[in-house]
Amino acid sequence: MSVMKALQRRKTIREIGNKKLPSQLLSNLLWAAWGVNRENGPFDTPGRTAASASNSQEIDLYVAMQDGVYLYNASHHKLDPVLAGDFRSLAIGTSQMDFVANAPVQLIYVVDIHKLTHTTGFQEPGLQNHEVQKSYYYVDTGLIAGNVYLFAASQGLASWFHNCDKTGLAAKLELRAEQRVLFGQTIGYPSKN
């Protein structure tokens, strides 16, 4: 499908079924979201499918599924196990969104401030300022989420970008002080046409 067609089909779909995604489809989704698309990116680091401030690659992409939570390792294009068990409900954040609690994939966007402030190469002006940091990591998250939306549209999948239980997820994932949970994104097959 062309990019223009994917853009035409891009939309938020909140009615998401519980049918599991095939492994290759999940693999392609994660690569499209935040994968390595070139070895020689800016500042002698691999480039990604979404831009980031000073190529800091400060967003960590966690994947919550029925069997556990994983961290997407873009360099090796694999999922590293983080936590066993079903924690998808934390990724949606509220009982008012229970209708997607059993969707097969819940992405969890986590910023690592250390990566943002300790990049090699060019440093964006003001990166030590917390408000400037927030503006960059929110934009960078949006770029990744946009890739997810376009991939979902191209594959006939449903996707919904939303808030999540930030405190609950941070505790379960045992995040470091310089890491922050930002948002969730639910992906699966549409439950309605």
PLM ranges: what are they?
Residues 102-104, 157, 178-180:
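Short coil/turn connectors at secondary-structure junctions
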Residues 10, 29, 61, 105-118, ...:
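Small-aliphatic-rich amphipathic alpha-helix that forms the alpha element of a beta-alpha
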Residues 2, 6-14, 113-126:
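Residues forming anionic-ligand binding surfaces in small-molecule and nucleic-acid pockets
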Residues 64-66, 110-112, 188:
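Structured loops at beta-to-helix junctions and adjacent beta-edge loops in soluble globular domains
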Residues 37, 70, 114-116, 192:
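Short, acidic Gly/Pro/Ser/Thr-rich loop/turn segments
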